[in-house]
């Protein structure tokens, strides 16, 4: 029958069109640090809501141990970094002569110090002479060190105890240190369902000192050679992340369910984190907050984390 033949032709046309769309999708692998980490937050939302496909991409998110993640990116084995901190994964590598770029920011910096509820530590200066557990090699610690210095604390007066980042929450619970320096999502995991800890403010010093709300910290990093060859793809990657960020803000319960399942964290923990001001989900092109990034570099240099100020080409500008 003619109508059957026509119907079959329509179905075939649709199938070919859909197949063509998928065939044109650009495949990218995005390595991230292992869960629970901020770098692993966006992948579950992007994939579940197909924000990559909507932008002509087929993204694969791969979690790697911290040492492997950093080694593979520094060696150029990985062209992109989904847990790219502005300092550890871009500026520090530039300091060492590697040509890498910060494409766009996803999360601004947030950190704190936690002490037991009954502790006599009330402000950051009270840490003098105390034992502080922290993950010293991370990008979080030098920025905390800088903020603590602004708050009047000489870190040389503190007994530092180094710990792997995964060991900080158990360290806080055990009471083996007077205080523990944390960031998200570890802080939310620690305080969920209890009132055993207090947070010591250090974040207010950033705006007081610099005048900026933005505090560039973690986003997408890339090898410059990859950037040069894939400039048409980069706006699509940004758009996929932008859609995910908007979704998290407008659909927090659905987003929390997706993220919690993938990260292996209790859903109420993620719900509370999204509702708080601590997540600091703030998406922007690296060049959009150049002045704030320069303040980050100056801060890192002042505490000895960076040897020199990186050139402005470290911050990707989509207009160039």
Model-derived features with residue positions:
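Short, glycine-/small- and polar/acidic-enriched structural segments
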Residues: 24-164, 171, 178-184, 200
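Short, solvent-exposed loop/beta-turn-alpha elements that line the ligand-binding surface or hinge
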Residues: 53-54, 204-213, 280-288
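Secondary-structure end/capping motifs
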Residues: 227-302
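Bacterial N-terminal signal peptides that target proteins for export
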Residues: 1-11
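Conserved C-terminal helix/tail region of periplasmic/extracytoplasmic solute-binding proteins
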Residues: 297-320
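Short, surface-exposed acidic
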Residues: 155-158, 263-275, 307-313
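Sec/Tat signal peptide C-region and signal peptidase I cleavage site
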Residues: 18-23
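Pocket-lining segment of extracytoplasmic ligand-binding domains
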Residues: 166-259
């Amino acid at each position: 029958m003619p109508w059957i033949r026509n119907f079959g032709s329509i179905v075939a046309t649709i199938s070919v069109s859909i197949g063509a769309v998928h065939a044109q999708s650009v495949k990218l692998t995005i390595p991230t640090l292992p869960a629970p980490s901020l770098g692993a937050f966006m992948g579950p939302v992007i994939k579940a809501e197909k924000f990559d496909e909507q932008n002509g991409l087929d993204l694969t998110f791969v979690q790697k141990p911290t040492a492997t993640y950093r080694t593979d990116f520094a060696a150029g084995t990985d062209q992109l970094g989904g847990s790219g901190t502005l300092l550890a994964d871009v500026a520090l590598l530039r300091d060492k002569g590697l040509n890498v770029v910060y494409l766009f920011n996803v999360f601004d910096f947030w950190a704190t110090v936690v002490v037991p509820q009954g502790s006599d530590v009330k402000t950051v200066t009270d840490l003098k002479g105390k034992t502080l557990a922290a993950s010293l090699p991370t990008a979080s610690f030098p920025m905390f060190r800088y903020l603590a210095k602004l708050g009047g604390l000489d870190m040389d007066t503190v007994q530092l105890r180094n710990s792997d980042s995964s060991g900080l929450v158990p360290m806080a619970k055990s009471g083996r240190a007077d205080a523990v320096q944390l960031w998200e999502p570890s802080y939310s995991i620690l305080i969920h369902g209890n009132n055993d800890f207090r947070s010591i403010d250090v974040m207010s010093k950033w705006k007081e000192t610099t005048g900026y709300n933005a505090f560039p910290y973690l986003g997408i990093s890339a090898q410059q050679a990859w950037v040069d060859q894939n400039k048409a793809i980069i706006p699509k990657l940004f758009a996929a992340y932008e859609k995910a960020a908007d979704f998290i803000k407008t659909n927090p319960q659905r987003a929390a369910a997706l993220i919690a399942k993938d990260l292996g964290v209790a859903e109420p923990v993620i719900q509370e984190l999204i509702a708080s001001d601590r997540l600091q989900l703030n998406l922007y092109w690296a060049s959009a907050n150049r002045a704030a990034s320069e303040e980050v570099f100056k801060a890192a240099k002042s505490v000895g984390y960076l040897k020199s100020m990186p050139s402005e080409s470290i911050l990707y500008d989509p207009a160039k």
